[in-house]
Amino acid sequence: MDTRRLLLCLCLWVACVVSKPTEKKDRVHHDPQLSEKVHDDAQNFDYDHDAFLGAEEAKTFDQLTPEESKERLGMIVSKIDLDNDGYVTEGELTAWIKKAQKKYVYDNVERQWQEFDLNQDGLVSWDEYRNVTYGTYLDDPDPDNSFNYKQMMVRDERRFKMADQDGDLIATKEEFTAFLHPEEFDYMKDIVVLETMEDIDKNGDGLIDLEEYIGDMYNHDGDANEPEWVKTEREQFVEFRDKNHDGKMDKEETKDWILPSDYDHAEAESRHLVYESDQNKDSKLTREEIVDKYDLFVGSQATDFGEALVRHDEF
């Protein structure tokens, strides 16, 4: 069963189940770290390798010779240079790093792609997605669940149209990725905020008041006294979430809550890589400048000799 249909079943099931009294729901989407390794170029470039390639792909480069590593890096450069002008800018490098860090997202989409691309044309239309996800309901509607399914289908169609940037109701793989994982794409952030507000706003006024905010993350049922974290969340709402202190969170206040503008690790790493590699200091990188600093970007057996010895000993 694919992720979206499983989610539909879970949504219907959850509606019938009482939550644990002290269970806390976290709706905040944080910008993840680029690597679990320490960023200390004086010791090694492991952090940079993980950031540029993703942790799993970085391991494969550690097993290549320097010549093989440079050759593969050269091929990667052409993918980073989106406008094909022969230069890699900080912006292009930031976009690449963010994409590398989202590999798990793209892998998830890849696993589902064939199931939705029914006519095998390399695209997924709204009709294809709707038929796969809601086909059973459309063929034989269940009156008891019809409202839930209809509501979710309308919501999915709205999100699909938002992800579909050219408006043809046919999604490329990138657009379909934005549809399934909207929190990962800047242009989809408004729909993430809207859906969150719809989930929490019980009185339908388009805003989130204190009780709705608390009610989304905490179920009072059977609890005589509120846990300490609930009291803290009440204080957070009054002092920080509700910025204009009108007793409710609007769209912008909700966005600041669930999509905080934390430190952008990808931008910082991009600036670092350009600074270290930009030989003529024109604030952009040529293919040659990047390949010359291959040990900073991707590594090889030579730059990861200690780990290579460990792997050899294991065999």
From Swiss-Prot:
Pfam family membership, one: EF-hand_5
PROSITE patterns: EF_HAND_1, EF_HAND_2
Binding, Ca(2+) 3: D164, D166, D168, E175
Positions of short motif Prevents secretion from ER: 312-315
Chief place of localization: endoplasmic reticulum
Sample GO molecular function, one term: calcium ion binding
Name by which UniProt lists this protein: Calumenin
Gene of this entry: calu
